[in-house]
């Protein structure tokens, strides 16, 4: 049995056509179903529906053999028990710093609000900046407006939400897309099966971008 961990939303919607190219079609619509384990058209493949931030945990610990996760989630997670064999080139966006439009660069210690705490600490440590990182779970744009933080680090798509709240994107930390991740033990134990799936998905990704 191959178990693939996916999260609902944009990543799921973009991943399903790629899985379909490998003959893997869920038995019911994961967006509408309340089930968290969904059988597929292949008797030896099932889907697990989990939170986006939990995908790497399920895969690293072997509860899922494979998963699809955004590079932002993988950068924050930083686990060791995963292979990342394929960039699926879906759910593209940017991980950026942002601050109030026209605001001067703060002197001294920087206060940064983000849900990407590990990414923020690494990014500013590499620059030699002293920072206080404040963990938030949502509505990052509010933090600079009410004096909670000087800057935020967040995923940016169009930047419209930032600008609507008086903020502007500033420094690019990473270009983000969704990646296929594989449990290291599963790759050893089911190598031929998983490698065949990786190759089929790679072909589907390339075919999608040829059009």
Swiss-Prot record:
<dbReference type="GO" id="GO:0005737">
    <property type="term" value="C:cytoplasm"/>
</dbReference>
<dbReference type="InterPro" id="IPR013820">
    <property type="entry name" value="ATP_PRibTrfase_cat"/>
</dbReference>
<keyword id="KW-0028">Amino-acid biosynthesis</keyword>
<comment type="pathway">
    <text>Amino-acid biosynthesis; L-histidine biosynthesis; L-histidine from 5-phospho-alpha-D-ribose 1-diphosphate: step 1/9.</text>
</comment>
<dbReference type="InterPro" id="IPR024893">
    <property type="entry name" value="ATP_PRibTrfase_HisG_short"/>
</dbReference>
<keyword id="KW-0368">Histidine biosynthesis</keyword>
<keyword id="KW-0808">Transferase</keyword>
<dbReference type="GO" id="GO:0000105">
    <property type="term" value="P:L-histidine biosynthetic process"/>
</dbReference>
<dbReference type="GO" id="GO:0003879">
    <property type="term" value="F:ATP phosphoribosyltransferase activity"/>
</dbReference>
<keyword id="KW-0328">Glycosyltransferase</keyword>
<comment type="subunit">
    <text>Heteromultimer composed of HisG and HisZ subunits.</text>
</comment>
<keyword id="KW-0963">Cytoplasm</keyword>
<dbReference type="GO" id="GO:0005524">
    <property type="term" value="F:ATP binding"/>
</dbReference>
<dbReference type="InterPro" id="IPR001348">
    <property type="entry name" value="ATP_PRibTrfase_HisG"/>
</dbReference>
<protein>
    <recommendedName>
        <fullName>ATP phosphoribosyltransferase</fullName>
        <ecNumber>2.4.2.17</ecNumber>
    </recommendedName>
</protein>
<keyword id="KW-0547">Nucleotide-binding</keyword>
<dbReference type="Pfam" id="PF01634">
    <property type="entry name" value="HisG"/>
</dbReference>
<dbReference type="InterPro" id="IPR018198">
    <property type="entry name" value="ATP_PRibTrfase_CS"/>
</dbReference>
<keyword id="KW-0067">ATP-binding</keyword>
<comment type="similarity">
    <text>Belongs to the ATP phosphoribosyltransferase family. Short subfamily.</text>
</comment>
<comment type="function">
    <text>Catalyzes the condensation of ATP and 5-phosphoribose 1-diphosphate to form N'-(5'-phosphoribosyl)-ATP (PR-ATP). Has a crucial role in the pathway because the rate of histidine biosynthesis seems to be controlled primarily by regulation of HisG enzymatic activity.</text>
</comment>
